[in-house]
A protein has these predicted regions:
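Non-heme di-metal
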Residues: 1-158
């Protein structure tokens, strides 16, 4: 396997840190509000995103850091606030992945980053937007905010 540049190592570290942060945030929401959709589904998806990135660390023989985010993420006063934060995070996620994609020459890295960005924009963002709408329309916490079906990637959904 080709050696990665320092920039590409930094790309992988930044992407993994972002996915770790997302997972820890959604896990905290579940801790605070219970098993509520779309957080339960998207937390599972974030775990698959982490697995996809960890496979790249393995492919390039890099040591992956552990997730340092649990217990260090923002907490929200309501499920509506958490859903709104989810929208903002997924919007920002697209910009992050576009920036990271512009700096890598590795086709293996680019494929994974594109899939993660697309999952975020095509599934997570709409799920959080629906959740915001439903929370504003009556505080429906456990029904109707489902993420929807996802695509498969190497044995797991993204």
């Amino acid at each position: 396997m080709n050696q990665l540049s320092e920039r590409e190592r930094a790309v992988l570290l930044e992407a993994l840190d972002d996915e770790y942060h997302a997972w820890a945030t959604y896990d905290q929401v579940i801790t605070d509000f219970g098993d509520v959709a779309p957080f339960t589904n998207i937390r599972e998806a974030e775990a698959r995103h982490i697995e996809a990135l960890l496979s790249l660390f393995h492919l390039f023989s890099l040591q992956a850091p552990h997730n340092s985010w649990p217990g260090r993420v923002e907490r929200y006063p309501s499920l509506l606030a958490a859903c709104e934060a989810g929208v903002s995070a997924e919007v920002a996620n697209a910009g992050l992945y576009d920036r990271l994609l512009a700096t890598t020459e590795s086709p293996e890295i680019a494929v994974v980053l594109r899939r993660l960005r697309d999952a975020s924009q095509q599934r997570h963002l709409p799920a959080f937007r629906r959740c915001v709408e439903r929370q504003r329309d009556g505080g429906v916490a456990q029904q109707g905010c489902n993420e929807g079906s996802g695509r498969r990637w190497r044995g797991g959904r993204l």
